[in-house]
């Protein structure tokens, strides 16, 4: 029999069992695609977490947090941003509207919240202005048969994501790749 490594818990969140380690993972998942209280539950659990991950969704959704810093409406930032010891991650499934994210981040910091530890997946896809335009055009085209879109570009965004024609964060740093991706997207959209 080979050597079995023994891992010990490095913090209050893990438990050593035998020769292995088990970490506590909490996942808050909504089944109704909407306002079920996921944000409130996440906010309560965030203060006892090491990492908070926003793994999907866009700026169309949001939740209100009331804490010692005041009252905040978060749309893209993970709920852990109010706690300095927490790593906050925006995952690859998020519809990343960079302008809205920066505005939300600045708003939180300007109100006295210490700059949060924020990490963005290089595989997060970027929301582009034409996603919002297409969403609005489609809702107008449907008229009374419209589905009640927030007109924030979510459906066209996820369409591009799953058709693999969108732009990921890692691609915006390479001018040639970005140019190719935009050219391909524009060609398909026209």
Tell me the role of every PLM-derived stretch.
Residues 2, 10-14, 18-20:
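Residue-identity detector for glycine
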Residues 23-190:
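Non-transmembrane, aqueous-exposed alpha-helical and coiled segments at domain scale
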